[in-house]
């Protein structure tokens, strides 16, 4: 179903009135549904529709994960992506959903090992502002300082012999210390690590931590739901990649697999068939050719090789010429870096050879 700007504006205003009315009558029951930030979707009303209908009207209401769990993984992913505005919003939402100050503090420290110190420093600054705005203590009462283990058990004693200091950090700090801290349970740590690995398209980390999550009490259905939830914050290519890997891990453990294209995250298939291709790709505001250009650019910049391959083929089918795609690769490379451009050029050359098409001049 397509909604014109005028119809959507009326719908959006009506939705806000309904939300305000329900909040007034049932403040506790509806406290979890946030109002859209003022003016946030003025320049992209369809994005606002997706936000209301799919993200908060559907995903956040699914029973497969608790609101607390969804808040934890959303904070973790937005930290990893350096999405400061969303991070601030979801830190407040996490506190409303039962995540404690101590847990928020610990999420930041945990995620930092997987997404880098700059993301941790940024998140620490943001959470301090959120605590201050809410009149909460600046230092969470349950947070503890470093307690290095005296005789750490090494999880990967033979890992990375070429970089022994990295091996020591991995074994002695990440696993023997951070993963053992009591501020978060092993289950919570596994959930946020699977979420961050999904968001960062870190395939090997997703593979390892899906297995570790199963060992730590995260169910198969919960892992599938984490992948689906994170998809809306880091993009569908990341969800497709994680779903494929999760399915392989489930199969390797003899766990039952759902049918369909995405057995690792079955609901993802419905969303891709409906929201992505059935609805968004069919909207008349952009041609399929232009949508292919945009999608190739994004998957190229994200080094998302599998999805880049899919959309390079789709771009050719949608009327893009080899010269246009070659030029697009060069253009995007200047903004995303030469490694992404070299990867894109290599994949495009493979596709052209498969199709018996000449390479661009």
Residue ranges with predicted function:
Residues 200, 302:
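Short, solvent-exposed interaction modules
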Residues 15-28:
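Bacterial N-terminal signal peptides
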Residues 87-88, 108:
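Glycine-/proline-rich flexible loop or hinge segments
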Residues 1-13:
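N-terminal secretory signal peptides that target proteins for export/translocation
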Residues 70-78, 104-108, 189-197, 226-227, ...:
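Short, structured motif recognition centered on aromatic/hydrophobic residues
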Residues 31-69, 81-82, 88-97, 103, ...:
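Acidic, glycine/proline-rich low-complexity segments that act as flexible tails and inter-domain linkers
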Residues 111-112, 230-231, 333:
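Transmembrane helix-bundle signature of multi-pass membrane transporters/permeases
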């Amino acid at each position: 179903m397509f909604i014109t700007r005028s119809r959507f504006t009326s719908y959006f205003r009506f939705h806000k009135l309904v939300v305000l009315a329900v909040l007034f009558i049932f403040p506790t029951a509806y406290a979890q549904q946030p109002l859209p930030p003022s003016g946030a979707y003025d320049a992209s009303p369809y994005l606002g529709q997706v936000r209301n209908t799919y993200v908060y009207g559907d995903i956040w209401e699914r029973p497969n994960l608790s609101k607390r769990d969804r808040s934890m993984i959303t904070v973790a992913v937005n930290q990893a992506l350096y999405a400061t505005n969303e991070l601030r919003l979801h830190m407040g939402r996490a506190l409303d959903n039962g995540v404690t100050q101590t847990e928020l503090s610990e999420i930041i420290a945990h995620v930092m090992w997987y997404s880098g110190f700059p993301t941790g420093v940024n998140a620490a600054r943001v959470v301090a502002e959120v605590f201050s705005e809410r009149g909460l203590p600046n230092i969470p009462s349950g947070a503890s300082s470093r307690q290095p283990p005296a005789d750490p058990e090494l999880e990967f004693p033979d890992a990375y012999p070429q970089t022994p200091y990295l091996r020591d950090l991995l074994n002695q700090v990440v696993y023997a210390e951070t993963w053992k801290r009591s501020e978060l349970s092993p289950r919570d740590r596994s959930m946020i690590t699977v979420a961050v690995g999904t968001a960062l398209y870190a395939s090997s980390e997703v593979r390892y931590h899906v297995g570790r999550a199963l060992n730590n009490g995260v169910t198969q259905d919960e892992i599938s739901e984490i992948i689906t939830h994170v998809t809306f914050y880091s993009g569908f290519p990341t969800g497709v990649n994680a779903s494929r890997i999760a399915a392989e891990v489930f199969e390797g453990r003899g766990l039952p697999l759902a049918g369909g294209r995405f057995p690792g995250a079955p609901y993802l298939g419905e969303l891709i068939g409906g929201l992505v291709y059935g609805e968004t790709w069919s909207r008349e505001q952009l041609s399929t050719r232009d949508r292919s250009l945009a999608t190739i650019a994004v998957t190229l910049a994200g080094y998302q090789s599998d999805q880049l391959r899919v959309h390079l083929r789709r771009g050719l089918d949608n009327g893009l010429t080899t010269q246009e795609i070659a030029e697009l690769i060069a253009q995007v490379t200047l903004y995303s870096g030469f490694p992404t451009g070299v990867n894109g050029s290599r994949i495009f050359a493979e596709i052209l050879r498969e199709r018996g098409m000449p390479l661009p001049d």
